[in-house]
A protein has these predicted regions:
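N-terminal Rossmann-like dinucleotide-binding module
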Residues: 1-46, 326
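Beta-loop-alpha module in the N-terminal Rossmann-like domain of NAD(P)-dependent dehydrogenases
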Residues: 46-108
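C-terminal helix-rich "cap/oligomerization" subdomain common to oxidoreductases
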Residues: 65-67, 283-326
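Hydrophobic residues in well-ordered beta-strands that form the structural core
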Residues: 91-92, 116-118, 247
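Rossmann-fold dehydrogenase core element
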Residues: 104-121, 140-142
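Predominantly a Rossmann-like dinucleotide-binding segment in NAD(P)-dependent oxidoreductases
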Residues: 125-192
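Contiguous beta-strand/loop segments that form the cofactor/metal-binding neighborhood of enzyme cores
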Residues: 182-253, 284-287
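Active-site loop of classical SDR/Rossmann-like NAD(P)-dependent oxidoreductases
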Residues: 271-282
Length: 326
């Protein structure tokens, strides 16, 4: 049983705890927050859980793995401290804001013999591998992915506030929050693109509300949309020489149907998981138990390619975060 610590007290941390407990591999041990009241209120549903307001004391406690879901710009420093304390680390996507930060964390994790995971749930879903296996026998002609969901924080933004998700201080925006899922799908299926470009609707601080991206491959292109000021119900489509594969969504894939040009229909064997984060929690636990050595190396490589592409796309759109260095 892995002793789990949590940094970040938003709804996503509650979801991960639920999923982690459902796997039977984790036990919630401790929670860190800057305010004790916040930590205590967060822990109420879980019984007697240790609460900390000092991150060093938190990391010095008996923990095996730390899940981090704080604002994006805080990830790097917090992950670094956790690795130095010899804890395995699961970081909610995007794990970092620059490719160099990711490379540094991977190097540090290797030196301290701990595991480092970026939690991009669609990449760890069993459905992802089912789709990838199907595509391995197809000639790809292109793809179109969309992840756009109206943000609950948009009214506050329109009222003149700057919520973390729209802040350049905290590395927010549609590309970082939702577009990263599209990149994981594309790069996970097709590999690293040879070039990429992103255009966006931006706030005065350069953070994007909505954008359209293109990934260029030698023989095809992948287009995607990411938005936090609109909601899209479009499916994801992958175009092949023999037909079109349609996924119900970019994340939480529970249906995949291929329709050939002749009208033949093939429904891929997708089994929806009871909780959308359970499969990633299961995969990380198995990796820590040394049951997925080759997969783990592939995950690190994919994450490196995602962050390289993510950074290039931000630069092409002129999205700059406060005090970032690369």
């Amino acid at each position: 049983m892995l002793k789990l610590g949590i940094i970040g007290t938003s709804w996503i941390s509650h979801e991960f705890i639920t999923a982690a407990h459902q796997t039977g591999h984790y036990h919630l041990q401790a929670v860190y927050s800057r305010k004790m009241k916040t930590a205590q209120e967060f822990c109420e549903p879980y019984g007697a859980i240790s609460c900390y307001t000092d991150v060093i004391d938190f990391l010095d406690s008996e923990l095996d793995v730390v899940y981090i879901a704080s604002p994006n710009s805080l990830h790097f420093a917090q992950v670094k401290l956790a690795i130095l304390a010899k804890k395995h680390v699961i970081i909610e996507k995007p794990a970092v804001t620059t490719p160099s930060e990711w490379k540094e964390l991977v190097k540090l994790a290797k030196e301290h013999q701990v595991y480092l995971f970026e939690a991009a749930r669609n990449y760890q879903e069993a459905a992802f591998q089912v789709v990838k296996d199907f595509l391995s026998n197809q000639e790809i002609l292109g793809a179109n992915f969309t992840f756009a969901k109206y943000s609950s924080k948009l009214p506050a933004l329109l009222a003149g506030e700057i919520p973390n998700i729209f802040s350049d201080v905290y590395a927010g925006g549609a590309l970082m929050d939702l577009g990263v899922y599209c990149l994981y799908l594309a790069i996970g299926f097709f590999g690293e693109p040879i070039s990429s470009h992103y255009t966006a609707q931006q706030l005065p601080n350069s953070v994007d509300l909505y954008g359209q991206g293109v990934l260029i491959y030698p023989d095809f292109q992948v287009a995607f949309q990411a938005g936090k000021n609109i909601t899209s119900h479009l499916p994801a489509e992958i175009y092949t020489k023999t037909g079109t594969l349609t996924l119900n969504a970019v994340a939480a894939i529970n249906q995949a149907r291929f329709v050939s040009h002749s009208g033949e229909v093939i429904d891929l064997p997708i089994q929806p998981c009871p909780h959308q984060m359970q499969e990633e929690a299961e995969a990380f636990a198995l990796a820590i138990a040394h049951q997925k050595p080759s997969a783990y190396l592939e995950w690190l490589q994919t994450a490196e390619q995602v962050h390289k592409t993510l950074y290039q796309m931000r630069q092409s759109a002129g999205i700059q975060f406060k005090d970032e260095k690369e």
